[in-house]
Structures are given as structure tokens and as C-alpha cells.
């Protein structure tokens, strides 16, 4: 919301700088998104008196001698039609910044710096300026809309600051307001807060007016939907004289982004911005039946609004009708059939409180919004409805544009505009704050906020102003508003008074990572060194993910916690596995053209002890790794698993496993010292097809709650071997069903000198018989007591081959 400092000063004597006021607003809970001067791009502009003005032959230019007061007299060349000797105009000195305009002299194209120049042989030491070049409009300053030089007041002194004269030195606060403070959606609302912050009296806008004896006989107002319109006020104004608004009103409206239309319409917009009350004015000559009725629209009923758009309504929409037809879409926009025109002679002013939810739904459903609907959506109180009407009628008299009749109707089924009493415990207020604010200080602060407090022992009695609907007690026995009172106290007292303290139940611990955190970080570093990128997903997944991975009905993964109010259906379950998120992530990467890669995630899965929940679920820290692409395989995933094992100085073993979403022959469970910690395998082909995945994908999940037992395992130093290692590469032909792990286990059991076994090739087809495969291993033998010669190593190989043949029927490939 835009708030001009000059307008704010109308109600509060502000004796601090704009920057200091910005700080006070921030400390009081109001975020100032931007603070800027109206003429922030304009600099070094002073009043100049043209002493002589001579035409330059054969051009439209004039060469002028300009008196700029303390800045001296300078020669300036000017092409404006209205330049003349004796005239006073804005002078941009050398080095000044002004707006550059297009050829139409109206369109701003940027900011330019004035330099010394030469035109038709005449030197020019500055520039005489138009209103557009200063960023001014006709609404901001009278005469600025003229397509020529901006004329300064006759009493303006040469050398005087033009920004001060034209109001370009005014400051603007762009304030972001929270939803719980609709009372601050106006200049007066912010002024109330500034008054309390600076402890200065609030000067209320004038609301006095005189009613004549003239009446609109028989006029009546009925509200058929009081749930949607708890208050509706109408007041008749006659002998209306349509015309322009005074310059001060047009300027203020322009500063907050509203263009002047006419005096009557401008008054409604002015009250909206000043008081926060949306107003509307109907041309009485177009109201039929001498009545106004507030009702729900009929099904299919139509209205053409002020922007000449036709809308078809339903009973969900609230309309303002005369005796025959709808004349306004309540809270959103008036009807074209009753708009204020140049010929308007009498008007009916409307000030109302409409239900915020209904206005919001109507605006969304019809795709129609306005300044008024935005204000109603945030909430309007009955106090502002009454004050807004009084202020509008005062302005009618002040501007001399009409006479106020004694005909007015006020239908009220809502709250009283009188302050409502509320009592809270001072002890409870201080307990919320965690500090001891003296009772007399609380009284002082709440008095500044216009709550008229009194104290009796521990009981603080407040008179809640009607415009503070966020603080109004919800019943006679409402004693639970002390947190709201605490908020009011501390934002005025100062948040800096709250000291950092530990909660009573908090435990003080030494800094640094614990064992689990250190182990987790080491694990992540290990995966990164193997080319994997960390990713993070929501802690939720979709029921369709469980179906995608084909989990049986009784699978533990389907025993998931349902979110009561999910973001959407795809994030409606707490994750019981990380695999679904990882497989979907691989699919998304492929769709973005990333056809290979390695990803990992460390996150919690949530295993409920029972459903519906009666106690907290078991949260288990889990690692999920995903690989995909032409270079990835079951064995590269096994290499990643072995890399994790090596980093922990443990050995993983693998056994075949069946998983609903993994390839039946390329899936294993992972064991660490005989304890199952997870699984890995190739994603099943049918799942890859459903996700349109082009390359093979592999996924691994490890339970870090179990694996963390080995995070701080002490590593023992193994001395370097005294004798040279011996390596042999052997290829074996075997049944397809035999696993790599079975071969490795058999070799290690047969020979105690085997240090390392690496699988480096798998081959099928060609000379390999049907149902068979070839697996090639590199086997490393390490002597312990003496060096091995070739003959002894060959004996090892022969025994290994014999044992493999005996156990599995394996043959050494020629």
C-alpha cells in the first residue's frame, strides 16, 4: 500500500526523518517494501527567471538569459512555444538529471544528464523543463500536462528548489500489510500506528456537515441477505455540481495511483484511500422505484458494469438493486446503468460492509476485481462504514459540489461501533513475552493505541476500538486474547527487549556434529566422489506411486500416513520408501534431455506403528541412490555399494531378492556383517515403459539407522605386503542362474590368500551355449610368509577351478 508522507502528516506531527520513520514502522510490525522520493530521478532543478528571450533566425529556437538566483545568470537555448521574457520556469543546471522524452514530448524514455552544449552556434548551459521532463502529470501539479515549459508560481524566487515547490521532494512508503490488520489498509490506519509509535496525538479528518430539510420522500433501503451485508448506509445528496476536483485532492489520489475522474467520483476514491471505506455513488435519476434492495442475484440475471462488461450472475452473487433492476455488483463494481455522468444532478452515496468471502468468491468467479473488492476481501469494519460516509458528506460541503439532504438510511445487523470491553491477565501477557513488562508501561503503550486501559491488580481491562476487529472479544467469556494483547505490547515496547534465552525444557549441548551427523556427511562426500548429485524431494508422495511400484496390498510400504489437508493428491501420503521419488526424478531428468547420471537422497521415511495414528511414527533415516544411462549397470551400482562399504571399513554381502518393482534376476538385498540393511537392483522394464524411460535405471535403498552402527568403527592399519601381489584373470562359463556373489564366496573359501576379486566382464551368446553365460574375474593373491612363484599360483587356480566345477558345474573358459 502506497502512503505519501505529506498525506500522513495531515494527521500526525512527524518530527523524524523518512528513514527513521521506516525503521519505526518495521519495528512496529509493518514491512516497508520500498521507501523512495517522488522525484527520486530528478536532481539539481531550480527556478529560473527568463530575463531576455531572443529568437534564433530561421529556427524555432530562442536564446535566453536566465537568472537562477544563487546559481547565477546563464545562457540557455530553448525551443518551447511558451518561453518568454519575464516567465519563471524550471531550470536543469549542468549536471542535473531529468527524464528524456520521445518526439511527442509526453512519453518518457529514460533518465538523462544535462551537459553544456551548443545549438546553432549558441552555447547553452542548462535546460528549461516541461512538467513531463520532471515526471509530473496534470494531477500531480497544475499546468504539468501542458505540452510546453512548466510555469512556476509568480512568487517563486529564482534559484529556489523546484522539487520543493512541485512536491517532488515528498516521500512514499510502500508498505506490505499482514492479513490480520485490515484496519491499516488506509492512510488513517497507518496514521493511528504512527501516532502511537511517536507518541503524538492523532488529528482525525473533519467529518462535520450540515443537513438541509430537503428530503427524498418515500425512499427506503432493505437488506434481504444480512449474512452477506451486515451494514448498509445510504445518504441522499442533491443540487450536485459536477466538475473537477481541487488540485490537492487530485495530487493525493495521483500519488497513490488513482487518476482524477470528477469531483463526486474522486470523493469516493479519496475516502477509500484515506479512511479505508469503499464508497459508491449512484446517479439518482437512473434509480427506479425510489428504493435500494440488497439481495442475492437471481439465476441468470445480468449486469453491465462500469467497464462496459456484461456478467451473468447466480444466487452466489450479491447485488444492489433499485426497485426494478441490479445497479451494482456488491463490493466489486457499480453498474453502467447508474454511473455518475457530467449531467448528474443528485446522487445516492453508499457505504457498506459486505462479507469478505462472498466478495472474494464473486470477484474470482466473474474474473472481476477492483480497488473496492480488494479492500472488502481484506475486511471492512462497521466503524469505517460510518466514518467513511461522514467524511464523504463533509467533502461534498467542503468542495461545494452538492447539498446534503436529511434523507439517509442505515441498516445495521453487525457489530456496534462503540468500544468493546476485554479483560486479560498481565501475568499471562508477560508469560507469553518471556519478559516482565511493568503494568504501568503496558497501560501507557495500550493507551497510545487507543485501548483506554485500566488496571486492577493483575487484571488489565481494555476498551477495544471497533476498527480493531482482529482484537474484538468473541463472547462475554472470551479470556483467551492475551496473546493478541502481548503482540500489541511488544511491538510498541520493542522486540529488542526480548533477550535470547533457552526454553525451560531445552538441553545445552556442546557444539559440533554428533556421530550420526558426521557419518551422514562422510557418506555424502563418498557418493559425491563417485559422481553422484544430491537431490531433495518432498516428504510426501502419491498413492499412484505405490501402484506404479506394484506393491502388494499387504506390503509395509502401503501402510502410509494420510495427510489431512494435502497440497494436492500427488503429495497426500508420508513417504514409506524413497525409491518412488527417485524413480520419478530419473524420469523427469530424461524428459529434460539428461540421459545419464547418478543421484542420491538422504531423508526420513515414516513408518506408522498403527493407523489411524495414536502415537508418533517411526522415522528412519534412509539413503536412496539412483543411476541411469547407457554406462550404468547392475555392477556399477554394486560398485557404489562397495564404495560405501569401503568408506566405513566394512564388507557388504549380497543375496538374491524379489522386489515388485525390480528386475527378477537383477535385484539383491544388502547385508552388513550378516544384518540386512537394504537392497538394490534394476528397475523393472514395465515400470520404465510406463514412465517412457529410454535408458536402464537402477535404484538402491539403505537403512542408515542400522548402518550408523559402523559410522565410528575404529580402523586398523594393515601393513603393506612384504611380497609382490600376483593377479590372474579367469573367465568361467556357468548357468545363468548362478550369481557373482556365489562365485566370489566359493573362491574366497577355497583360498585364504585371495585379497580381491573384481568382475570385469559378462558375456552371453556367440560361442556360449544356450542358458549359459561367461563371467570374467580378476583375482589378486597376496603372499604372507614367502613370495609365490608361477607354479604355486597355478596350483591355486587349478584348485579354485575344481571347486567351482564341483559346487556349481562351472567350466574354465578356453
Task: For each feature predicted by the language model, list its residue ranges.
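Mobile "lid/hinge" segments at catalytic clefts and subdomain interfaces of large enzymes
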Residues: 120-129, 133-135, 144-148, 163, ...
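Glycine/proline-enriched, intrinsically flexible loops and inter-domain linkers
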Residues: 5, 55-57, 198, 202-301, ...
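Beta-rich nucleic-acid/ligand-interaction surfaces
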Residues: 39-43, 209-213, 463, 507-508, ...
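Phosphate-backbone binding interfaces of nucleic-acid-interacting proteins
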Residues: 1-211, 348, 367, 371, ...
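Terminal amphipathic helices with adjacent charged low-complexity linkers/tails
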Residues: 198-223, 400-429, 436, 485
Amino acid at each position: 500500500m502506497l502512503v505519501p508522507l505529506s498525506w500522513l502528516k495531515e494527521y500526525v506531527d512527524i518530527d523524524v526523518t523518512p528513514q527513521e520513520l521506516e525503521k519505526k514502522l518495521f519495528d512496529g510490525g509493518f514491512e516497508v517494501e520500498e521507501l523512495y522520493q517522488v522525484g527520486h530521478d530528478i536532481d539539481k532543478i531550480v527556478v529560473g527567471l527568463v530575463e531576455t528571450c531572443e529568437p534564433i533566425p530561421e529556427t524555432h529556437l530562442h536564446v535566453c538569459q536566465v537568472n537562477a538566483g544563487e546559481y547565477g545568470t546563464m545562457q540557455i537555448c530553448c525551443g518551447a512555444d511558451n518561453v518568454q521574457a519575464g516567465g519563471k520556469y524550471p531550470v536543469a543546471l549542468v549536471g542535473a538529471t531529468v527524464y528524456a522524452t520521445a518526439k511527442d514530448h509526453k512519453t518518457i524514455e529514460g533518465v538523462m544528464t544535462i551537459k553544456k552544449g551548443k545549438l546553432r552556434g549558441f552555447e547553452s548551459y542548462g535546460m528549461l523543463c516541461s512538467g513531463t521532463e520532471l515526471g509530473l502529470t496534470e494531477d500531480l501539479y497544475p499546468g504539468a500536462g501542458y505540452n510546453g515549459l512548466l510555469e512556476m508560481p509568480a512568487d517563486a524566487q529564482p534559484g529556489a528548489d523546484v522539487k520543493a515547490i512541485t512536491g517532488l521532494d515528498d516521500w512514499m512508503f510502500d508498505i506490505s500489510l499482514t492479513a490480520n490488520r485490515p484496519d491499516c489498509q488506509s492512510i488513517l490506519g497507518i496514521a493511528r500506528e504512527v501516532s502511537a509509535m511517536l507518541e503524538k496525538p492523532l488529528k482525525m479528518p473533519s467529518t462535520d456537515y450540515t443537513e438541509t430539510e430537503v428530503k427524498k420522500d418515500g425512499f427506503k433501503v432493505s437488506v434481504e441477505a444480512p449474512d452477506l451485508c451486515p451494514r448498509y448506509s445510504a445518504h441522499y445528496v442533491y443540487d450536485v455540481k459536477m466538475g473537477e476536483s481541487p488540485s490537492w485532492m487530485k495530487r493525493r489520489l495521483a500519488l497513490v495511483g488513482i487518476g482524477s475522474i470528477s469531483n463526486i467520483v474522486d470523493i469516493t476514491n479519496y475516502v477509500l484511500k484515506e479512511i479505508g471505506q469503499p464508497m459508491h455513488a449512484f446517479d439518482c435519476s437512473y434509480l427506479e422505484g425510489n428504493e435500494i434492495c440488497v439481495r442475492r442475484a437471481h439465476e441468470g440475471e445480468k449486469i453491465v458494469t462500469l467497464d462496459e462488461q456484461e456478467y451473468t450472475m447466480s444466487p452466489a452473487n450479491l447485488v444492489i438493486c433499485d426497485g426494478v433492476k441490479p445497479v451494482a455488483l456488491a463490493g466489486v463494481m457499480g453498474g453502467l446503468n447508474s454511473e455518475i455522468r457530467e449531467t448528474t444532478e443528485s446522487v445516492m452515496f453508499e457505504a457498506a460492509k459486505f462479507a469478505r468471502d462472498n466478495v472474494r468468491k464473486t470477484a474470482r468467479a466473474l474474473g472481476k476485481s477492483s480497488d473496492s473488492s480488494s479492500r472488502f476481501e481484506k475486511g471492512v469494519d462497521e466503524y469505517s462504514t460510518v466514518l467513511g460516509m461522514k467524511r464523504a458528506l463533509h467533502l461534498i460541503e467542503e468542495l461545494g459540489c452538492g447539498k446534503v439532504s436529511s434523507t439517509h438510511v442505515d441498516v445495521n445487523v453487525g457489530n456496534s461501533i462503540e468500544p468493546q470491553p476485554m479483560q486479560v491477565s498481565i501475568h499471562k501477557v508477560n508469560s507469553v513475552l518471556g519478559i516482565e513488562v511493568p503494568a504501568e508501561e503496558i497501560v501507557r503503550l495500550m493507551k497510545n493505541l487507543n485501548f483506554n486501559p485500566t488496571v486492577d491488580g493483575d487484571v488489565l481491562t481494555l476498551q477495544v476500538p471497533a476498527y480493531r476487529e482482529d482484537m474484538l472479544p468473541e463472547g462475554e467469556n472470551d479470556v483467551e486474547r492475551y496473546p493478541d494483547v502481548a503482540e500489541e505490547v511488544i511491538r510498541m515496547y520493542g522486540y529488542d527487549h526480548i533477550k535470547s534465552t533457552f526454553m525451560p525444557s531445552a538441553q545445552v549441548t556442546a557444539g559440533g556434529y554428533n556421530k550420526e551427523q558426521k557419518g551422514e556427511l562422510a557418506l555424502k562426500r563418498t557418493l559425491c566422489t563417485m559422481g553422484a548429485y544430491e537431490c531433495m524431494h518432498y516428504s510426501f508422495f502419491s498413492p499412484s506411486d505405490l501402484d506404479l511400484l506394484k506393491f502388494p496390498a499387504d506390503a509395509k510400504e502401503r501402510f502410509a500416513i494420510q495427510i489431512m489437508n494435502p497440497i494436492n493428491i500427488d503429495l497426500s501420503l508420508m513417504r514409506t520408501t524413497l525409491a518412488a521419488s527417485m524413480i520419478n526424478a530419473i524420469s523427469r531428468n530424461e524428459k529434460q534431455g539428461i540421459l545419464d547420471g547418478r543421484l542420491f537422497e538422504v531423508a526420513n521415511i515414516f513408518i506408522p506403528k498403527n493407523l489411524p495414528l495414536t502415537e508418533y511414527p517411526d522415522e528412519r533415516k534412509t539413503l536412496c541412490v539412483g543411476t541411469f544411462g547407457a554406462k550404468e549397470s547392475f555392477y556399477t551400482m554394486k560398485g557404489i555399494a562397495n564404495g560405501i562399504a569401503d568408506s566405513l571399513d566394512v564388507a557388504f554381502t549380497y543375496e538374491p531378492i524379489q522386489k515388485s518393482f525390480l528386475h527378477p534376476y537383477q535385484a539383491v538385498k544388502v547385508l552388513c556383517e550378516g544384518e540386512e540393511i537394504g537392497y538394490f537392483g534394476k528397475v523393472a522394464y514395465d515400470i520404465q515403459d510406463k514412465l517412457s524411460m529410454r535408458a536402464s535405471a537402477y535404484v538402491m535403498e539403505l537403512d542408515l539407522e542400522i548402518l550408523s552402527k559402523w559410522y565410528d568403527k575404529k580402523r586398523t592399519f594393515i601393513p603393506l605386503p612384504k611380497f609382490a601381489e600376483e593377479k590372474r584373470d579367469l573367465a568361467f562359463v556357468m548357468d545363468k542362474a548362478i550369481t557373482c556373489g556365489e562365485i566370489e564366496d566359493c573362491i574366497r573359501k577355497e583360498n585364504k590368500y585371495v585379497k580381491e576379486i573384481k568382475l570385469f566382464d559378462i558375456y552371453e551368446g556367440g560361442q556360449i551355449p544356450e542358458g549359459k553365460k561367461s563371467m570374467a574375474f580378476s583375482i589378486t593373491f597376496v603372499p604372507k610368509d614367502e613370495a609365490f612363484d608361477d607354479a604355486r599360483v597355478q596350483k591355486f587356480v587349478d584348485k579354485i577351478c575344481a571347486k567351482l566345477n564341483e559346487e556349481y558345474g562351472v567350466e574354465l573358459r578356453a
